[in-house]
Amino acid sequence: MKKVLKILVPVIAVLLAVAVTVVGLFYDKIFWDTDWFIEKSQTADVKLTIDADEKGKELDGFGCSSCWWSQIAGKSENMEEIAKLLYSKEGLGLNIYRYNIGAGSADNPDTNITDPWRKTESFYVLNEETGEYEYDFTKDAEAQKFLDLCLSYGCIDTVILFANSPHYTMTLNGQEYGNENWWVSNLPRENYEAYAEYLITIAEYFINKGVPVKYISPINEPNWSWGVSSVNQSQEGCFYNSEDIYDVYRACVKEIKEKNLDIKLAGPESGEIGFRLYEWFEYLYNDEEIRPYLGTLSYHSYWSDEQLHNKIGLGNWIEEKITDIPVEMSEWCHLPCTALIDSIDGALLQARTMANDLNYSNINSWTAWVGVNGIGIGEDGKQYSDGLLAGNADLSEYQVAMRYYAVAHFSKFIPVGSVKIETEKNINDVTEVKEERDGEMVTTLMKYGVNCVSYLTPDGKIVTVVVNDGATRKIDFKVDAQYMSVYTTTQEAQMQQIYEGEVAEIELPEKSIMTIVFE
């Protein structure tokens, strides 16, 4: 026995030494060589486990804002083509339409807003004979015409009226943007009731016209100053502090009651996922006066494109605090826009943002900012735009941006009434950066290489959208289904069906968006 031990002890020692060395090398690779880890995670094959029994939020749909461009599209020779691309079944089939109640920058002779796309006609106009302001619903005619055309295609079931600023005659500085004292709202308290009456009167007009107006959003991005610099004076906007927000909502509730109007409030459309968003959501949700007239809570997911922890944190909070009212991500675009109009990079960011907002943030709907935007020429002489469509000044020429197809991967396959279900990956491909702040380690960047979300449709299909920011790899599925149809978008081909047959492992192309429909 002693001889055996004499032989075994050195052998075990050698094996332990080798094991420690290997583990040490592996540790060094994983924890010190970040580039190696990221490279491996961006090329590793993926297996998704999709569990239709783990259900989340029901989907109310997808949409875009008509702000800044519908009045241009409404007088363009390409009006019908643009409308069909966005709001018909042949196009994106969007069902949510955000109509901007303009603050009158196109009517105000003293405005500093010079861009004709950003100027708005108001329904509240000066009668030069009487010297009084009155309502004229023949105004904003081109934007109304475009809305009517989009409604005629039958996809829209939700119209949201939103205002970036009160009418310029109601503001402190007589402008549609904030005053120099950024911490003071440009809407004085004595005009809250007048502003509420103005909004609800306009809503009543659209409802009587037969437009399916569900919500009115009186406040938009109250976080920002909208006037301290000349940059902020280039578009309509208004700062509000917390008490301002709550009192404006109360004024709107009072007006809705008086008019006995079948409409609810949305908002307050925080411009980012930050601490104010939580404060505003919680107050509006729990206020006994406002709550019965609150139809949905709305926010914008700007400045979190690579801060997935913000989206996860919001989703966890909503799950705990907001139990019986819809939450909508009501505005996002690529900001600042660094992707070319025809680049897959813009589409990947668009799709990744949509997938993560839907998968992690516990929302019921997702709405893009501008459906159409102008074309900007960068310092490199190339064309940039954050719109789903991009065109020249009068939209006599336009093109479909690559990010349009990103939206199509969701809106054309996931109908209203679908329910989010659980999707798990077999790889940990997170990139995370932490910094020390006030003695604590704080996450400043967090993102995945492969992002995905799945829905169970009303007719029993499972739809999964996968966004691959990495290299070509294999993807396999564990799902209660027998057949699947697969559609991909890459730089070379958009919305191309690449497979139809039994559920199987397939190739996930590099830098691609993939929609899989399981049956």
Model feature map: region roles:
Residues 4-35:
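N-terminal type II signal-anchor transmembrane helix
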Residues 41-214, 218, 236-241, 246, ...:
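N-terminal catalytic cores of secreted or lumenal carbohydrate-active enzymes
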Residues 64, 93, 159, 216, ...:
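Conserved, mostly hydrophobic/aromatic
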Residues 194-212, 222-335:
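Active-site neighborhood of glycoside hydrolase catalytic domains
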Residues 326-412, 421-432:
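Aromatic/acidic polysaccharide-binding cleft in carbohydrate-active enzymes
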Residues 427-482, 511:
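Carbohydrate-binding surface patches
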Residues 480-494:
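Solvent-exposed beta-hairpin/edge-strand motifs
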Residues 499-519:
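C-terminal beta-strand-rich structural cap/linker in extracellular carbohydrate-active enzymes
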